[in-house]
Swiss-Prot record:
Pathway: One-carbon metabolism; tetrahydrofolate interconversion. GO terms for cellular component: cytosol. The gene is folD. Its EC number is 1.5.1.5, 3.5.4.9. NADP(+) binds at G166, A167, S168, I232. The lineage of its organism: Bacteria, Pseudomonadati, Pseudomonadota, Gammaproteobacteria, Alteromonadales. This is Bifunctional protein FolD. PANTHER family: C-1-TETRAHYDROFOLATE SYNTHASE, CYTOPLASMIC, C-1-TETRAHYDROFOLATE SYNTHASE, CYTOPLASMIC-RELATED. Keywords: Amino-acid biosynthesis, Histidine biosynthesis, Hydrolase, Methionine biosynthesis, Multifunctional enzyme, NADP, One-carbon metabolism, Oxidoreductase, Purine biosynthesis. One of its GO terms (biological process) is purine nucleotide biosynthetic process.
Length: 284
């Protein structure tokens, strides 16, 4: 068996084209374009790359992009004050603060300061709670994008045994909630999980988000499983690889995401979808 590749780059581009058409229609109807404020604190190289991609994506679909690049010494109070300004700005529908933040700034305070109706990252406790209560509104971008990828396979997820490896607030935990919503029997694995191999071998649907290159051997994959690799790891030679040993895993899985070109583009596409949703549902 050789797995079919789930082309996240192509699916994300389709979404972006659809969003661009919707924004054009809004403008032609005399409505404003959605606005996204992107806040970067410090000069972390990876964060700069991510933020640049998000800003370019906004411009591509016709959103208004507000950029705030703050020095790494910016105080927590100053950052919270900027968020307050964005909260009150009627032209801004979504606020994104790029994580991680400098050590002197408490991330939970920052996340909770963003108004829930402008929390297009889907991290605010209100939005996480809505997902837990099975009435999601603004959803965490990476899990949301992954669900779009899974849907693209045409596989019925009801009753599948799903395993999520990684229990972060950004991916693992909301991912498990998303899978529960689609009828999966969901297991979350983390650094204290015993018999990880046994759990993986039972998975009809496997999502791996641990940030360790080749962490999951390909021969652990259950024949016919769907494999979603969230990891983006750069090796010494510069090559980007995922958390799953791709070549071996592709011999067992029915569908698999590549790295790069799998989950990454979908995270940004979902951010754009959330921003348009916030504009239409909350701020029109």
């Amino acid at each position: 068996m050789t797995a079919q590749i789930i082309d996240g780059k192509a699916i994300a581009q389709t979404i972006r084209t659809q969003l661009k058409d919707k924004v054009t229609a809004r403008k032609e109807a005399g409505q404003r374009a959605p606005g996204l404020a992107v806040i970067l604190v410090g000069a972390d190289p990876a964060s700069q790359v991510y933020v640049g991609s998000k800003r370019r994506a906004c411009e591509e679909v016709g959103f208004i992009s507000r950029s705030y690049d703050l020095d790494s010494s910016t105080s927590e109070e100053a950052l919270l004050s900027l968020i307050d300004e964005c909260n009150e700005d009627p032209s801004i529908d979504g606020i994104l603060v790029q994580l991680p933040l400098p050590e002197h700034i408490e991330e939970s305070k920052v996340i909770e300061r963003i108004r829930p109706d402008k929390d297009v990252d889907g991290f605010h406790p209100y939005n996480v709670g809505r997902l837990a209560q099975r009435i999601p509104v603004l959803r965490a971008c990476t899990p949301m994008g992954i669900m779009t990828l899974i849907k693209s396979t045409g596989v019925d997820t009801f009753g599948l045994d799903a395993v999520v490896i990684g229990a972060s607030n950004i991916v693992g935990r909301p991912m498990a909630l998303e899978l529960l919503l689609t009828g999966c029997t969901t297991t979350i694995c983390h650094r204290f999980t015993r018999n990880l191999e046994d759990k993986v071998r039972q998975a009809d649907l496997l999502v791996v988000a641990v940030g360790k290159p080749g962490f999951i051997p390909g021969d652990w994959i259950k024949p016919g499983a769907i494999v979603i690799d969230v990891g983006i790891n750069r090796l010494e030679g510069g090559q980007l690889v995922g958390d799953v040993q791709f070549d071996d895993a592709a011999q067992h899985a029915s569908f698999i995401t590549p790295v790069p070109g799998g989950v990454g583009p979908m995270t940004i596409a979902s951010l754009l979808e959330n921003t348009l949703y916030a504009c239409e549902q909350y701020h029109d």
